[in-house]
Regions:
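Helical (often loop-to-helix) elements that flank the catalytic cores of nucleotide-handling enzymes
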Residues: 30-49, 74-85
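Ferredoxin-type iron-sulfur electron-transfer modules and their immediate structural context
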Residues: 51-56, 63-200, 219-233, 238, ...
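Long hydrophobic segments that form regular secondary structure
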Residues: 2, 121-215, 304-311, 315, ...
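Core alpha/beta catalytic barrel or barrel-like domain that forms the active/cofactor pocket
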Residues: 8-24, 49-67, 92-105, 341-348, ...
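Short, hydrophobic beta-strand segments
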Residues: 21-31, 65-72, 311-316, 352-354, ...
Length: 551
């Protein structure tokens, strides 16, 4: 009623266990009048809380926001006792000054200066859903949910979990991005300090789903890197990683030569030193033939005569060149379950370009994929992908990078795009895939779900798909990001952090698994990290399910 009297609404969320209600009035603190209204509403809220003998803070601290209302809530006499206790234990006022006693007015250090215009820098991504890139960074409310340990679980934020460094939290990155974009200089994107802080972001996208405000640091990092690259020419290694699909395509006709140089101890060490890859890391090798060539040769024989459905298979660059076994397993699994597969001459997923901030090049690939795949994909023929980081770009970055003309088609395509595990779990739920199609033999499966898969789709489809065989016991490793994060863990300056992230939960769980336990990971870089970090071979879910398929 009080908020309504001022014409205001509020966002509410609560903790059942502590009986606490969070109230976030929708107030524009950039407006001088609204900023004054903040104090008025806070004062009236404090009086309401006092009236009903409640607490202003619940299980939270009072701090600078609520400290000035403590005398009202507990009474002047009790407040004087608090001040006496504070003086006894902290006579010089050096321990958290101004947080509970002698707190300054709650509106004396507001983040925004009322009346100061919000910058509107041009961007490559479409940030219109939150009012522009500056407001995307401003979404952070400082709650600190990103400051959690691996013991608590979840995905956000792996670099903080491994280091405990506040600078590497989602909160710190969002706020320093905000300050950078408000900076009064010709090019606010030209900041080495921002580059170094964002450099240790693994782009797991955990903040996209776990941050209460939905701050997407991976998206902000990608945008920043394009502007930074415009001023500071990227290194040879950065260009190589971004152009990896082209390099793979070039060597796909002579994979033996590529693999010799990649696996020979002497030549591999030279490559790593020249490019800046970690000496401890093994270089991914090329498959003897591409998945696309294999499909052209074998698909007609695999496709069922009387299919129960049809899918358009997205041939991503990682499956195409590196993970032929996973691709073959996916094709045999889907056709064995009764689905007809089609595939088109799609471009690469643009994942390497997006990760390294080459957004102009990424847009070209995105445009081609939309134009090529759009006419083929529908409710009756969904787009299904094998590598999570590649296929999920259709649902995440593609609509925001497609441009005004293609955005509607990109959004439509996103609605019909699924990971392999999502598709299989959905078809099982619909009754078109049945348990009887799979073995009754028992098996234990330990699975690490790809970080972007967890952030965008959740782990549930992976666990559901792997659990279709009736006697398969599936357990998810309670890990966040594996630590490899695409090319991140290959880079020499990031190797140690990648290992620390892996050692938080993933590596110990894999090492403790019995020799007969099936280790599973949908992500190509996750599987590589598990192999390098533990010596165990992790399989793609398609390989696990194909081995369980009857007939």
């Amino acid at each position: 009623e009080m908020l309504a009297s001022y014409g205001k609404e509020s966002v509410y969320h609560a903790h059942i266990g502590t009986g606490e209600l969070h109230v976030r009035p929708l107030i524009n603190l950039k407006d001088a009048g609204e900023a004054k209204l903040l104090r008025t509403i806070a004062e009236e809220t404090a009086r309401i809380v006092k009236k009903y003998r409640g607490s202003m803070s619940g299980e939270h601290g009072d701090g600078r926001l609520r400290g000035e209302f403590i005398p009202l809530i507990i009474g002047a006499g009790n407040y004087k006792l608090n001040k006496r206790i504070k003086r006894v234990f902290d006579p010089n006022g050096i321990l958290n000054p101004g947080k509970i006693t002698d707190t300054p007015p709650m509106d004396s250090s507001l983040r925004y200066i009322p009346g100061k215009p919000t910058p509107e820098p041009a961007t490559h991504y479409d940030f219109s859903d939150c009012g522009g890139v500056v407001r995307a960074a401003e979404k952070c409310n400082g709650s600190g949910d990103c400051r959690k340990s691996s013991v608590i679980g979840g995905l956000m934020c792996p670099s903080f979990m491994a280091t405990g460094d506040e600078r590497l939290t989602t909160r710190a990155r969002a706020n320093i991005m905000r300050e950078m974009l408000y900076a009064d200089r010709d090019n606010p994107w030209d900041s080495r300090e921002i580059y170094e802080i964002l450099d240790l972001c693994l782009a797991c996208k955990g903040c996209r789903s776990e941050c209460p405000s939905g701050v997407d640091i991976a998206k902000l990092k990608s945008e920043f890197l394009q502007h930074y690259n415009d001023v500071h020419p990227p290194s040879l290694r950065t260009r190589l990683i971004a152009s990896l699909p082209k390099i793979y395509s070039l060597f796909s006709f002579i994979p033996g030569i590529f693999n010799f140089f990649a696996t020979n101890k002497f030549t591999a060490l030279i490559i790593k030193r020249v490019t800046g890859f970690a000496a401890e890391r093994s270089i991914p090798v090329l498959a003897p033939q591409t998945f696309r060539r294999w499909l052209k040769k074998n698909l007609s024989a695999l496709n069922p005569a009387n299919p129960i459905g049809e899918i358009c298979l997205f041939v991503d660059e990682f499956t195409n060149h590196n993970d032929l076994d996973a691709g073959k397993a996916a094709a045999k699994l889907l056709t064995g379950l009764g689905y007809r597969i089609t595939f088109a001459g799609n471009a690469a997923s643009a994942r390497t370009y997006i990760s390294k901030g080459f957004l102009r090049q990424a847009k070209k690939l995105i445009t081609k994929n939309i134009l090529v795949l759009g006419p083929l994909v529908s409710d009756d023929c969904p787009l299904v992908g094998i590598e999570p980081s590649a296929i999920l770009g259709f649902r995440d970055e593609f609509p925001d990078l497609a441009g005004d003309k293609l955005r509607p088609e990109a959004s439509r395509l996103a609605q019909h795009t699924f990971t392999l595990e999502e598709f299989i779990a959905g078809e099982f739920s619909a009754g078109r895939i049945k348990r009887e199609m799979f073995t009754r033999e028992p098996a234990e499966v330990l699975v690490h779900v790809h970080c972007q898969e967890k952030a965008i789709t959740t782990s549930a489809p992976v666990l559901a798909a792997l659990g279709i065989p009736v006697n398969y016991k599936v357990r998810e490793i309670p890990s966040g990001c594996c630590g490899m994060a695409g090319a991140f863990g290959y880079e020499k300056e990031h190797f140690e952090l990648a290992q620390k992230v892996g050692e938080l939960v993933l590596f110990p769980d894999v090492r403790s698994a019995s020799a007969g336990t099936i280790i599973c990971a949908p992500g190509t870089s996750c599987r590589h990290h598990v192999k390098d970090g533990t010596g165990r071979v992790a399989l793609h879910p398609a390989e696990v399910l194909l081995a369980a398929l009857r007939g």
